[in-house]
């Protein structure tokens, strides 16, 4: 067509040439508009197909039967035995995954993407913790045990296969608050080059039936995906207390969550790249089922630091600070009998604030002694409040 316009343009007057140019531009504009309308038509056709297609039924795979059929639990209620559509890769069909059934509920038409619970997503996940054993004072024996039962199986599982024994599946750390249980777990994750997943057990306690158990299940699935990994369950007594026969619906839900945790502990290989560490300061109320062989096999006490331990902890914190030369670590350790590692850290921080308030850039021995007295007053108040609560509870 453009050739015809060229012939007309050569044999025509200037006005006619201008008209031809306008017509050419109009044709180009119309061609673009036709293409846009074609795209819009295809879009609406696709939308109409979606609207007219029958809805699918969501279901969860329970088991794959020997004859190739699948047992599923449908969202509408009953368990069904269904077939797999020919276009579905049968290797993708595994227990626990979500699938879409046709409206009659007889065939799996689609494998749905796996969803991760928002609570699991928000758990503290540290790809590579930066805590080392050298930052922990007074816990040499506890570090040795953790290295043997957590770090060694993660780094050298073949040693256990050769000798024919299985390492412990889980480790339980117990002791007063602030004694370094979380730091121990982070340090062993650092040395093992493992992802550290920190969860407080109370996060498992949900108000809807089955929610807590599902979160536990998804937590272990995430840990397997991120392996090598260490799951650290803090305050496990929140869901692991001794079970009672009669309780509220909330207590029954916590018991279901505990049962799911026990099932997960029973269900994984101790030589896998996932290790479980739990911590509590109330080991006396834990359910015996948690402590039986095959679950939390190794129980490690993390006590308040002794004189030597307190000296080491003071040295760890003070060597990072600007201090005067006359600091007497032994005297500081004597003055802090009964202090936890967290208390000693608070002493060092409080002493630094005293120096800052006075406009000094170094911490003195007097600052540290005053800080010890201040922390002692706070500790005594907390103890007094605790005693009153126990008296009137």
UniProtKB/Swiss-Prot annotation:
InterPro entries: 26S_Proteasome_ATPase, AAA+_ATPase, AAA_lid_3, ATPase_AAA_core, ATPase_AAA_CS, NA-bd_OB-fold, Nucleotidase_PAN, P-loop_NTPase
GO BP: any one term: proteasome-mediated ubiquitin-dependent protein catabolic process
Biological source species: Saccharolobus solfataricus (strain ATCC 35092 / DSM 1617 / JCM 11322 / P2) (Sulfolobus solfataricus)
Gene Ontology MF terms in the entry: ATP binding; ATP hydrolysis activity; proteasome-activating activity
One GO CC annotation: cytoplasm
Protein name, entry field: Proteasome-activating nucleotidase
Coiled-coil annotated residue ranges, if any: 15-53, 365-393
Record keywords, A-Z: ATP-binding, Chaperone, Coiled coil, Cytoplasm, Nucleotide-binding, Proteasome
Pfam families attached to this UniProt entry: AAA, AAA_lid_3, Prot_ATP_ID_OB_C
Family: Belongs to the AAA ATPase family.
List of residues binding ATP: 178-183, 317
Biological function: ATPase which is responsible for recognizing, binding, unfolding and translocation of substrate proteins into the archaeal 20S proteasome core particle. Is essential for opening the gate of the 20S proteasome via an interaction with its C-terminus, thereby allowing substrate entry and access to the site of proteolysis. Thus, the C-termini of the proteasomal ATPase function like a 'key in a lock' to induce gate opening and therefore regulate proteolysis.
Gene name per UniProt: pan
Region feature Docks into pockets in the proteasome alpha-ring to cause gate opening, mapped onto this chain: 391-393
CDD domains attached to this UniProt entry: RecA-like_PAN_like
